[in-house]
Amino acid sequence: MRLAVSRERTGLNHSIDKVLTRAGPVGSRQTADHQLISPVRASASGAPQCRLSRCSQFNASCDPRLNLLPGFGYITADVPFYPFSPTITAELTFVSQSADESTETVADALRNDPRLAQAKRLVAEAIGDHASRLSVRPAAESLKSGFADLIDRLSAVRGGPPIWPYLSSGLGRGPYVELADGSVKLDFICGIGVHGAGHSDPGMVAAAIDAAIEDTVMQGNLQQNPASVVMMEKLTALAQASGAELPHCLLSTSGAMANENALKIAMHHKTPADRVLAFDNAFAGRTFAMATLTDRPNYRMGLPLTFPVDYLPFRDPANPERSTRWAVDELHRLLKRHPGRYAAFWAEPIAGEGGYYPGSHEFFTALCQPLKDAGVPIIFDEVQSFSRTSRPFAFQHYGLDAFADIVTVGKITQVCATLYSSEMKPTGPILSQTFTGATASIATGIEMLNRLESNNCFGPSGQNMQMASSFQDGLANLATKYPDLVRGPYGEGMMVAFTPGDGSFDFAKKLMMHLFDIGLLGFVCGGDPTRIRFLPPPATTTQAHIDHAIELLDQGLATLP
């Protein structure tokens, strides 16, 4: 038996000097060390009756749940580069094993098959070779006609034209994406916050390949795979990291469904209460119930209301004390007018579709404390704000852990979810779904959570706040240079916006389309004024990308017809 250290990038294999040649008694342990000089994967092999019980090198560790097959197997752990060459230690415990007993499932053997690792390396190399050619450029003349036909077909089959002529070619590089007309854009909207690692990210592709060899395309409430458990445990651990009590999690296929489940939980808990409190300009999703909650009358045109909603004014960053006082006064008026009728208070910690207005600890505490006192469940909608501030959740960023009864996430998490407290746990079978998510969504969701952590996105001086500060500084400079075209910046963390021109929708859309043609993707939000917003991908955005975005914005403002 030996501990092998393999260099994934070069294919060179290096074994430790000390080779353990024979198995020990059942329950005995042996250790082996190897000094690391570059990023590697560590694996144990050739041990017919042992399992790897501990594998450590400073802050990284192997997964002890993955045991070796008789005679052959791998247990891997990513090891970062350290200039002082740390030592990896593997401790192996010998276990009793009958001839017909296996420490792995057949599926584990498939996942650990070296041929799959080789296939993933080949795919990554091929994508990298082709994606390296991508940089912002206009459409290819030879592809324009066919692309226009595709857009016409899309418009016909969906019953109306898309907001902009976007059909991806299927290839990208970080925040850069190639369209089917050969043009390349700097994507700083990312599906309105979905593509947190950008496009064609190697880690996300590898996770999707792992999902592709699973037994089903979809997971559900009745039948699901272990990755669902891992995803739910990761989300609840993140949510409870600073004091919130949110031990339960239900996966779902969209942010709207996550919000539907949140309201079901709250209304079930507070029955017969039937009213909901929300903020002006709230956006909760496109389902029937969420259209009622959303404060956009044109989004529910011709649709009956499903439950009564009362709206509070959101925090005004220009007048925080006065707007807080107005919101609190209105809250007390409504609680007095409808005693015992409120089933939930639904809130985005950072108003997204409403115009990228940030909340604050003081503002939300002034509202949430009387709501807690009145026994009204508090729902934080983090479908757009998750992963974009100094903490994984914006409610943590604002220090609101004590008030979180139910929290929803989505978009960047790839699979959406509703987290809730023990007190909110339903007493009846009101929560169930045929689909909890695609197998690939769950696998890439786990990869995304890992990437956000490994990219040092969080913390007061983390990547999110650094990139956000740089982006806002660049927008502030443009506001000085083009005072009639740019007001702002606005937002919080990696949710950044500015008000273009007179703040009208028509002007904002005109500039948005002009930026699209130049090669920068942003999107409108808000209503009065209408703003242009950006959601850079946190797991891949660098200072060079921020600088390029400001350069393209400058070009767009200077050449706006």
Explain the meaning of each model-derived region:
Residues R41-S43, M512:
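Compositionally biased low-complexity segments enriched in histidine and/or tyrosine
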